[in-house]
Amino acid sequence: VKLHHRVDGPSGAPLLVLGPSLGTTTEVWRPQLAELTSSWRVLRYDLPGHGGSAPATGFTIDDLAAAVLGLVEDERFAIGGISLGGAVATTVALRVPGRVRGLVLCCTSARFGEPGPWRERAELVRAEGVAALAPALEGRWFTPGFDGRWVLEGLREVDAPSYAACCEALAVFDVTGRLGEVAAPALVIAGAEDPATPLDQALTLADGIPGASLTVVPRAAHLAGVERPGAVTTAIARHLRDGGREAGTRTRREVLGDAHVDRAIAATTGFTRDFQDFITRYAWDEIWNRPGLDRRTRSCVALTALVARGHLEELAMHVRAALRNGLTPDEIKEVLLQTAVYCGVPAANAAFAVARRTLDDLGPEGP
């Protein structure tokens, strides 16, 4: 499966991948684009036979997830999607948990009902074309009185066999039993009046994904981001901003210990708050949570850098962190011996003194 995509936003910004709902294109995310591209490089893709993507059949949601991953060169990224796009996003988060820094599931589900109706819709579309669905979809996508013609008009351009194949992929999609495996900070967005993926399906996602939050958008149906763009955009932007902070705080506690982090938070003032937020998101989420190195290796790098720059006031803290990350005292000694060669004997001598005092203070029970 080959997916057409487009990228907007600053070239050096973190990546956010956004997938559409069945029957729509990259344009369904247009109302959110201006706000999200102020902080993110946004990659939007089209489903097979939709927008700029070539027709295709015989694929699964897992195949679509693989195709999306083929578009992503970044080591870490956030991903979101509407309805079918949300199913793809969930599948990506399950396939590469260490790479997904944030997850947005908009008007979607872990399972889209019984297979029968989806297969019937596939047969109808093959016989009569996608445009035949427009009257029914208008009532599912939008609440009464909302003018969503600019979205509905796109149905005329959708390839019928590809649309039918999407229906058949949704018919067998079910990750209900795997929601507990989703590791990324997740936001679930539901339209309060969505008949396609009702609130109980959103609650299943929010309850099943560890730590997930739920936003219910009033006066909105299935395409909540089109019908109530302000509420949806605000929820997504806040989640992506706060999700990095939450993930960073969790990693910081795991590496440095609750006592240290609690002291740092208690000591935060209005003057230092922005800096604390910066290091939590940038150092402890964006760097420490990258999958390229394990935490033992990152501790070795941190110890070496602190010795090289003479930051002895931080070294004791990172000796304790190295023990938490699985290094033994003998391995810490080997790291410091290596620094004597490349950072200088005086620097290593001072580091050994700090490390010895730290290890002596901890005793045999460790950090």
Stretches found by the model and what they are:
Residues 182, 188-190, 194:
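Short beta-strand/loop motif that positions the catalytic acidic residue
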Residues 212-244:
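Catalytic active-site module of serine/aspartate enzymes centered on a nucleophile-bearing elbow/loop
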Residues 113-116, 127-181, 265:
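Conserved alpha/beta-hydrolase catalytic His-Asp/Glu region
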Residues 1-17, 37-41, 234-243:
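Alpha/beta-hydrolase fold catalytic core
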Residues 242-296, 324, 348-367:
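Acidic, glycine/proline-rich low-complexity segments that act as flexible tails and inter-domain linkers
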Residues 81, 85, 89:
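Gly/Ala-rich beta-loop-alpha elbow adjacent to hydrolase catalytic centers
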Residues 27-34, 40-80, 234:
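Active-site loop/oxyanion-hole signature of alpha/beta-hydrolase fold enzymes
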Residues 90-95, 99-134:
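Flexible "cap/lid" loop of the alpha/beta hydrolase fold
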